[in-house]
């Protein structure tokens, strides 16, 4: 052992993402113009009706919608447990956009699940199939969706490698917190891979102008990482056809919720259907 790492917190408040205190405060409020565009779409979107949408880097998404540029959603899940209330909020939003000619990518975070020592490969592959059935039942057109395991989509890994060149240690510490980086450093690999997921719809193999993540606000840390690393790496990303810095579109959960509600933590989660006992 050659070094002992010490750090000093210079500002108060939880970082965005997995250690957020009040998840409903993450991101920026959506503008009136976005609500007008969504109101002109076919069908109804609850967070648009009650004007509760929040965003990260929302202007490129707004401009792409106004100019009718090609758009793809990146929205998936970690297969760590049963379908829950947060999933249905997100899946209904994906279904709404699909019905209005926005296509969807659905990354399955098997890389992150594989790092979870509580889950065997057999268990998380079971939850992949179980969750996909529920997403389909919630209205997502799986036949029209690019569903993939992170570990099998080489283009995601290529993009993650490109953006990782712009990574500095202070960035994930600021986003995810020093405690997370000290106690669970391999998580950073999963975080950078998710950046590749969010950028993937713009890859030259698919040729889309803009991509955006649809999620709960607990994923804001990944969106911050995506925006910052994409900005730092845009010139290199252009070699892969990437044109814009991705956006994030957040569906608020229950107001005032403390911590991260997740299928990884059954005691904090509102399940729909069979729940964690299969």
Residue ranges and their predicted role:
Residues 1-78, 227-278:
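Non-catalytic terminal extensions that flank enzyme cores
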Residues 7-10, 80, 155-159, 168-278:
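Active-site cores that bind ATP or allylic diphosphates and position pyrophosphate for catalysis
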Residues 77, 107-112, 145-157:
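Short, glycine/charge-rich beta-strand/loop segments that flank catalytic centers
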Residues 85-89, 119-127:
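Alpha-helix N-cap and loop-to-helix initiation/capping positions
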Residues 107-122, 251-254:
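Short connector loops at secondary-structure junctions
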Residues 123-149:
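A glycine-rich helix N-cap at a beta->alpha junction
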């Amino acid at each position: 052992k050659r070094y002992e790492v010490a750090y000093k917190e210079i500002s108060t408040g939880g970082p965005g993402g997995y250690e957020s205190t009040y998840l409903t405060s993450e991101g920026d409020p959506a503008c009136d113009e976005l609500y007008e565009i969504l109101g002109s779409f076919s069908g109804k979107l609850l967070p648009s009706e009650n004007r509760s949408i929040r965003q990260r880097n929302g202007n490129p998404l707004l401009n792409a919608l106004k100019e009718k540029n090609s758009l793809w959603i990146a929205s998936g899940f970690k297969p760590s447990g049963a379908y829950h209330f947060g999933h249905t909020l997100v899946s209904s939003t994906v279904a709404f956009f699909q019905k209005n000619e926005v296509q969807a990518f659905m990354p399955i975070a098997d890389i992150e699940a594989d790092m979870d020592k509580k889950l065997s490969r057999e268990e998380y592959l079971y939850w992949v199939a179980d969750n996909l059935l529920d997403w389909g039942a919630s209205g997502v057109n799986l036949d029209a969706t690019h569903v993939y395991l992170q570990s099998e989509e080489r283009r995601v890994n290529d993009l993650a490698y490109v953006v990782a060149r712009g990574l500095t240690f202070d960035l994930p510490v600021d986003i995810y917190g020093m405690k997370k980086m000290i106690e669970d450093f391999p998580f950073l690999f999963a975080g950078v891979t998710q950046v590749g997921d969010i950028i993937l719809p713009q890859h030259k193999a698919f040729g889309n102008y803009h991509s955006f993540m649809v999620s709960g606000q607990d994923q804001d840390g990944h969106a911050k990482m995506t925006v910052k690393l994409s900005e730092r790496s845009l010139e290199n990303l252009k070699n892969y056809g990437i044109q814009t810095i991705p956006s994030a579109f957040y569906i608020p959960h229950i107001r005032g919720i403390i911590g991260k509600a997740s299928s990884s933590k059954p005691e904090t989660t509102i399940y729909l259907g069979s729940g964690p006992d299969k």
